[in-house]
Amino acid sequence: WLQTYRPEWQVHVTAMTGGLTSINAAGPRSRDLLNRLVDDVDLSPDAFPYFSVRTGTVAGVADCIIWRIGFTGELSYEVHVPSGYALHVWETLLATGEDLGVAPFGVEAQRILRLEKGHYIVGQDTDGLSKAPTAGLGGLVKLDKPDTVGLPELKHAYERTDLPVLVGVQPDDPMIVPEEASQIVDGETNTILGRITSSRMSPTLGRSVCLAQVDPSLAAPGTTITVLLGNGSRIPATVQQHHAHVDPEGARQRV
């Protein structure tokens, strides 16, 4: 981007991603675990709040990047380790946290947790028509800043009323999990008014949970929508107040 916007700067970009391995320590005891292996970073909530980053030593490995973020909705840290030391850090985390009940968790478990929390996957729950105000990110955008690259487009997005809106959806029958990409239709005309973008059965709630892109006319909480399933049947579902089905206040990840 800088090479096209400021060609006179002669910017060169070196990809560093391949030199780092990311390990996600998540759960109510994740801070306890990292405190045993990190001695040069204060992990207390006040010193290291949610959505912040530090650089420190983990399991004796220097220059690790520690983010207090995560995709699970729980207290969580992403630890980015120089790849040559990744196996050492991984094995040390498991051994050190044995009495805490530490265990590996897979991508499918992460995807269920993120959906319960309402975290969306870019490119699955969003698309080319998704904009900050319709994807639940309106509070992160400051339109009163001095002119910046992309500001006219952002302002235009806030003025539009025809863009699809990302919402949380709950099937009225909690045991039905609509297939992802199931169409949301007008019950009388079959006009397509949206689609289910993510869906899973929630072990936490014992029911299905979904995210969906819907026409603005259906985006208000409490609105009943019609979902067309792959077998041709239709089910009613209700638009929820939040994207998050679990802990919408974010209390778990901010402790």
Predicted regions and their residues:
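Conserved, structured C-terminal
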Residues: 1-255
